[in-house]
A protein has these predicted regions:
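Conserved N-terminal phosphate-binding loop of PLP-dependent enzymes in the Aspartate aminotransferase
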Residues: 1-479
Length: 479
């Protein structure tokens, strides 16, 4: 039995904390006393198999002894030193990234550390504009790159742009006054299941004589229409995290060809997909999203770089950009970037991932899980599409498989206003939780799932059983 007074904790939590996704009147939370492996453990001892991996970031699993021991050693050695000082941990992590993990990439040269994912994106945008002397950055429909001032300009998920919604469906969403889209523009998403350009994949590959996917062709036209001489970079997720979209495998190679043709930079946002999530070290290397090796100019990292034992972000830059940064005095620093204890977490996490070949384990687990999902799709009429690999999965939930009709018409353009209790993802997640499994999603009709990259077959079977139960519940409720 817990020694913590959780009744008192609940009182303080409700009284003093600002909560996400609910008004004060809607207050309700799940208390977690500890974590273990792939489980969250509640005060009463209930074990919840975490198959959204705390926002897909605990790649090595919870409480890994080697990582925890390394952090404790760093705490014994360090209080704090700031960015201008070098610790052994910082140098070792950079060596692990560039020499060991990215040694065959053909592009990666140096690393700049940041506070987390959004800060890494901010740093990459700053570098892109400084290096090129150009102001504009191209983003994409449904992209998510963070919610800080620069990153949010490229986040094209409506709830993440508007920041606040109301319990009443009739009330307007609360938006930040003024423009939050300065020096950015949006390009089409490679969302084949619901193509905004009206095409069908794979037939769309034959739509043009040059073989360009229509979404890539339209992206290039938009960049040209904004004047290539003013465009610094395009930023893409290798697969969409919050937006939950798996692009076709031709997309990333064609984006690389396009950026080379136009002479712009390509930033790959690997904050969520990095470190084994898609069954490769980085998402842009995964064979589920690319037909060949591709070379970005910069790559943003966070989450899996420490398996979220402690917060850390990073930007990996190419040799050309590294040479440029070596030629200037880089004055953009912050207090906590490269914190020695966070760097220790990264060092011991990366060593663990390398030693245990975690990307390969993720890929193997994904093959097993896909087979289980396909079995479920044959039983449940509401499973319209399955996408994913490794330990990141997208399931489109539909009224009708043939017409692809969504239960919530707004889909990825939802504002999060009104009664959300009948959203398919909430019905699914609530029912799965009854079976001790946590799954979720950010958009109403799309289930987003994935555990630690070393999730076992027994744990995957537990997830599949819970999903079978949950989809049965959904179909009884909504059909």
């Amino acid at each position: 039995m817990s020694s913590i007074d959780w009744k008192q904790i609940a009182e303080w939590d409700k009284k003093y904390n600002v909560h996400a996704f609910s008004t004060a009147a809607e207050y309700g939370t799940t208390f977690i006393e500890r974590t273990e492996g792939n489980y969250l453990i509640k005060p009463d001892g209930t074990r919840l198999l975490d198959f959204y991996n705390q926002l897909y970031c605990v790649n090595a699993g919870q409480n890994v002894p080697e990582i925890q021991a390394g952090i404790k050693d760093a705490l014994d050695r360090y209080g704090f030193v700031w960015d201008i000082y070098t610790t052994d941990y910082k140098a070792e992590v950079s060596k692990l990234l560039i020499e060991d993990i990215l040694k065959d990439s053909g592009w990666a040269a140096k690393v700049r550390y940041a506070l987390g994912g959004g800060d890494a994106v901010e740093t990459a945008l700053l570098i892109a504009r400084l290096y090129t002397g150009k102001p504009l950055i191209a983003g994409r429909e449904h992209g998510y790159h963070g919610v800080s001032a620069g990153a949010v300009q490229l986040t094209r998920m409506v709830p993440s742009r508007s920041f606040a919604s109301y319990e009443s469906e009739e009330a307007p969403i609360k938006t930040v006054p003024g423009s939050v889209f300065q020096n950015t523009f949006v390009c089409p998403a490679p969302f084949c299941y619901r193509c905004s350009l009206g095409h069908k994949y794979p037939a769309c590959k034959c739509a043009r004589a040059d073989g360009l996917l229509p979404c890539v062709a339209q992206t290039e036209e938009l960049i040209r229409s904004h004047n290539v001489a003013s465009v610094a970079a395009i930023i893409t997720e290798p697969a969409y995290g919050a937006g939950t979209i798996m692009p076709p495998p031709e997309y990333l190679p064609q984006i690389e060809d396009m950026k080379n043709r136009l002479g712009i930079l390509w930033i790959v946002d690997e904050v969520l997909m990095g470190f084994g999530r898609l069954g490769a070290w980085f998402g842009h290397q995964a064979d589920c999203v690319t037909t060949r090796p591709v070379k970005p100019d910069m790559m943003t990292l966070a989450k899996g770089i420490t398996s979220s034992a402690l917060p850390l972000g990073a930007v990996v830059v190419s040799k050309e950009i590294a040479d440029f940064m070596d030629s200037i005095r880089w004055n953009h620093v912050c207090t906590f970037a490269g914190h020695p204890v966070c760097m220790a977490a990264a060092k011991y996490n990366l060593e663990y991932l390398i030693k245990n070949d975690i990307p390969a384990k993720s890929k193997e687990a994904g093959v097993y899980f896909r087979a289980g999902l396909e079995d479920l799709a044959s039983k449940h009429s509401t499973i319209g599409f399955i996408g994913g690999a490794g330990m990141f999965w997208q399931v489109e939930i539909v009224k009708d498989k043939d017409t692809r009709e969504a239960f919530v018409p707004e889909d990825r353009f939802t504002t999060f206003s009104g009664d959300l209790s009948k959203w398919p993802i909430h019905l699914i997640s609530d029912a799965a939780a009854e079976k001790g499994v946590l799954v979720g999603g950010f958009v109403p009709n799309t289930l987003r799932m994935g555990g630690a990259c070393n999730t076992t077959k027994e744990e995957l079977d537990k997830v599949l059983d819970a999903l079978d139960y949950a989809f049965t519940h959904l179909e009884k409720t909504l059909l």
